[in-house]
Amino acid sequence: MHAIIIHGMGRTPLSMSLLAYRLRKAGIKTNLFAYAVTFEHWEGCTKRLRQFIERKVAEEDFIVVAHSLGSVLTRAVLPSLSHKPAACFFLAPPTQACDAARRLAPRYWYRLLAGEMGQLLAKHEFMSNLPVPEMPTKIYAGNAGLTGRYSPFGDEPNDGVLMVKETLLPGIPVQIAPSLHTFIMNNKVIAMDIVDTIKSGKYKLS
């Protein structure tokens, strides 16, 4: 079993290294995809991701584990794959034009650093038209962000970047984790849940 692992915006594959280690320890081969939102455009990045997946897994069984923007890239690429993943696991995925992206989109420094892909996260039409995975998928949402009077999210459960309700997709199960957005991939419970799901054969994975 292969795992294609995709990091989030402004990060590198290094941010997913602990999760990758835990999966490898369980006997899962890991392949980490790298991209840079500051220097890449959406079309080129999704094309590279599709080619990366096809090259790394060939006809072998595989899953996708993606953090944040990585899940958006994954959803865009899935329909074009001739060999589909057996399952997808999304960590803190933005599934709509989230409040944080909409607030940051007009700012010059954000446009400069986050590039085209950062702007797309703030567009309702773009986010609502992304394909919903047809294969078994699970979402992990963090709720360790500040709530209450001094929180930009008010009383809404959040991970410091996304509100939990901004990570949901119809018909896809979600597991809440006491994690912040930036570090949710280091949550051992999530890694073990992915491993247990695969090993248990729940999704009929080999």
Which ranges hold each PLM region?
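Serine-dependent carboxylesterase/thioesterase catalytic core
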Residues: H2-M9, L14, L18, R22-A36, ...
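C-terminal catalytic-base region of ester-bond hydrolases, centering on the histidine
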Residues: P133-S206
